[in-house]
Amino acid sequence: YYTDLDKDSKPGKFAELRELLPEGAKYALHAGEYYPNHTAIDFYHHYKEDIALLKEMGFKMFRLSISWSRIYPTGEEEKPNQAGLDFYRNVFTELRNAGIEPLVSIWHFDTPLALEEKYGDWLDRKYIALYEKYVTTIFNEYKGLVKYWLTFNEINNTINFLPDNASDEAYQEAYQHLHYQFVASARAVQIGHEIDPENKIGCMICGITYYPLTSDPEDILFNRSKWEKGIFYCGDVQCKGCLLYTSPSP
């Protein structure tokens, strides 16, 4: 927990996985120099100004993410963090007043750090129930304010980012990770439609392009298998309900 509330004064927000950087991953700070990569646009404090600019430019939709750890700081609390819920409600209300439709990512590589340390990276079935609790909370909280949802951002990168020489065990772990996320995603779709039949809930696939090394048929077929496992597999499961690929290795 940020005992000093973080330099950005984010109340009640525990660390998430993306914030756990190894030593040396951040640049040293030097007095008098400006580092925009450290604070980016600081949307937390400037969302009203940012949304006003989006309205001025004529934008009709704005995609953003809800941070799981801002709603359930460790992922296992019985009650959500009200300050986190209020922040997103204020953002969505501001968007509605500006005539901008929010498109919300429910999970964007931001598993609460406490869950990661306790259960590993989506390698325990307990994640499914915890994710269900999280999505139930936000679907209820923002009913009428948010209609368009994405369950998992770039879910297929679990496979895409494996090295070419990954072992069968690494593939087995990656597919187990995906399986739990597929189940959690399906449950989120069910829950979301039960809470609000007007909800539109989809998936987000990272569009990575693969090219064959040569025109040799074996290279063409290998390239096709990369497309199937890296792109189509995750899309087919979530869009068609088809689980077609069973081989754990490339």
Where are these regions (language model features)?
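Active-site region of glycoside hydrolase catalytic domains
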Residues: 1-21, 31, 75, 92-247
